[in-house]
From Swiss-Prot:
GO biological process: autophagosome assembly; nucleus-vacuole junction assembly; vacuole fusion, non-autophagic
Gene that encodes the chain: vac8
Cell compartment(s), UniProt: Golgi apparatus membrane; Vacuole membrane
Positions where Phosphothreonine occurs in the chain: T548
Topology class, membrane: Lipid-anchor
Protein name: Vacuolar protein 8
GO cellular component: fungal-type vacuole membrane; Golgi apparatus; Golgi membrane
Length: 550
């Protein structure tokens, strides 16, 4: 602000004063007076703003410079919602041929653009066009301030699309490669702010942003690394852009893996999330494992910092979808940490990702199922499941349903009392939890050496197997009715006299089975799955009658 004061004081010099119009001399005097008492003056009020405006619109560059510097200092200390009478003179100063005036005016505009209402007004008053022009300035300070202002403007959702279509993305992308680290930071920060909608991401990709962002990943500046990594992570949300990345950026995965080993937790976190988003595609699921990402992900998984744990477990969840990755993940030592994360009750997302990963790992191999069970996963699931949030219950019951497919481990699951937690969950408020729990019970009911647990749980807890079968047979959802009818057939075909007697004496079950079979009369067309339900119900009734006759 010293420059501002000295410039205003110079106007009192005799040889300079005749060059000023009366209103400009008055404005200089008024501004000096206001500045002497600056802590008590509202510079956005009528008289101070009038003085600043007169100087801003002066033909005299020294007075314009004073106004620009004053605006820069005032807005640094006092940011509030302002009207066009404040912003318009600042925008006018941006058009000055003088680099110092441009620099100070862009600082003032960037300060004002911290306020949401001001952000919208700057764009409404065509400030973007002026800032784009400033970004093309040969002066680094002007570039830096202009890009910083656009970064602020781009945090307002209603501005993002306007910026994307304004022609700003090309200059921003070029300035992201600037040799000045401040310009790089501001430019990559602005590009990041433009990655939060599909339409804007399309505009970014069309502007050639991807190769620039990838080239900056090895930057020595943590902020630039963070902005670029996060931008790539957001761009990788879209399948079409993942395809583009796969075609044009062969070093991307290895660069992101290296960033998981940096000293900055926020960069590590975003690198893992970027890999997670890339791993939505089968190609990347394989490449990430083949590129030796597992040791770094395991290290992050064992961190005490929740965002790092969440990012890494989310990445592992996606990677584990591919059958070829199941054994490498298990062999890399992930099972114990994943089972431990089931107890992370302070973050249900972590719980969901951990148990979903276990389910994926169990999908195609008896060896993997055995490893998961040996890692004490069943104990953890049984202990936690009834008190877990619904989203976690859904994943846990789905995992149990997969584990219950294995004939080798059904008796283990039953003897561990898993029915006692699954039965109450068949009456959950969540349709998914109901269905998964019933599917797990159905899987356990087939080809078991000992059905004593089903006998013990026939009437309890929570209405027992009996109550669950009645609810599901009564359901309008053919999938639920199918699970119940299929389970009844399995229990009857097991040939356990006491279990068969329970079913035979259950008039409600028999009545519901008859109602389902009756739908077959004079009806040649069925909704999805209904025909199978009718066939299974008929099979169940046949087995009941057969056992009764014998």
């Amino acid at each position: 602000m010293g420059n501002c004061l000295s410039c205003c004081e110079k106007s009192k010099d005799e040889q300079y004063e005749p060059l000023l119009a009366d209103r400009e001399r008055e404005a200089v005097a008024d501004l000096l007076s206001f500045l002497e008492d600056r802590n008590e003056v509202n510079f956005y009020s009528e008289e101070p703003l009038r003085a600043l405006t007169i100087l801003a619109y002066s033909d005299n560059l020294d007075l314009q410079r004073s106004a620009a510097l004053a605006f820069a200092e005032i807005t640094e200390k006092d940011v509030r919602e302002v009207d066009r009478e404040t912003i318009e003179p600042v925008l006018f100063l941006l058009q000055s041929p003088d680099a110092e005036i441009q620099r100070a005016a862009s600082v003032a505009l960037g300060n004002l653009a911290v306020n949401a209402e001001n952000k919208a007004l700057v764009v409404k008053l065509n400030g973007l066009d002026l800032l784009i022009r400033q970004m093309m300035s040969p002066h680094v300070e002007v570039q830096c301030n202009a890009v910083g202002c656009i970064t602020n403007l781009a945090t307002l959702d209603e501005n993002k699309s306007k910026i994307a279509h304004s022609g700003a993305l090309g200059p921003l992308t070029r300035l992201a490669k600037s040799k000045d680290i401040r310009v790089q930071r501001n430019a990559t920060g602005a590009l990041l702010n433009m990655t939060h909608s599909y339409e804007n991401r399309q505009q970014l990709v069309s502007a050639g942003t991807i190769p620039v962002l990838v080239s900056l990943l090895p930057s020595s500046d943590t902020d630039v690394q963070y902005y670029c990594t996060t931008s790539i992570s957001n761009i990788a949300v879209d399948a079409v852009h993942r395809k583009r990345l796969a075609q044009s950026e062969p070093k991307l995965v290895r660069s992101l893996i290296q960033l998981m080993d940096t000293s900055s937790p926020k960069v590590q976190c975003q690198a893992a999330l970027a890999l997670r988003n890339l791993a939505s595609d089968e190609r990347y699921q394989i490449e990430i494992v083949q590129s030796n990402a597992l040791p770094s992900l395991l290290r992050l998984l064992r961190s005490s910092y929740l965002p790092l744990i969440l990012a890494s477990v989310a990445c592992i969840r996606n990677i584990s979808i591919h059958p070829l990755n199941e054994s490498p993940i298990i062999d890399a030592g992930f099972l114990r940490p994943l089972v431990d994360l089931l107890s992370c009750t302070e973050n249900e997302e972590i719980q969901c990702h951990a148990v979903s990963t276990l389910r994926n790992l169990a999908a195609s191999s008896e060896r993997n199922k055995r490893a998961i069970i040996e890692a004490n996963a069943i104990q953890k699931l049984r202990c936690l499941i009834l008190d877990a949030p619904v989203s976690v219950q859904s994943e846990m019951t789905a995992c149990l349903a997969v584990l219950a497919l294995s004939d080798e481990f059904k008796s283990y699951l039953l003897n561990f009392g898993i029915c006692n937690v699954l039965i109450p969950l068949t009456d959950s408020m969540s349709i998914e939890v109901q269905g998964n729990s019933a599917a797990a019970l159905g899987n356990l009911s087939s080809n078991v050496d000992d059905y004593s647990r089903f006998i013990e749980c026939w009437d309890s807890p929570a209405g027992g197997i009996h109550g669950y079968l009645v609810r599901f047979l009564s359901s309008e959802d053919s999938t639920f009715a199918h699970i119940a009818a299929w389970t009844i057939v399995q229990l009857l075909e097991a040939g356990v006299p006491r279990l068969t007697a329970f079913i035979q004496s259950s008039d409600d079950i028999i009545e519901l089975l008859n109602d389902i079979v009756a739908r077959d009369a004079n009806n040649g067309e069925y909704e999805d799955g209904e025909g199978d339900v009718i066939l299974l119900s008929g099979r169940a009734l046949h087995l009941i009658e057969q056992d009764t006759d014998s």
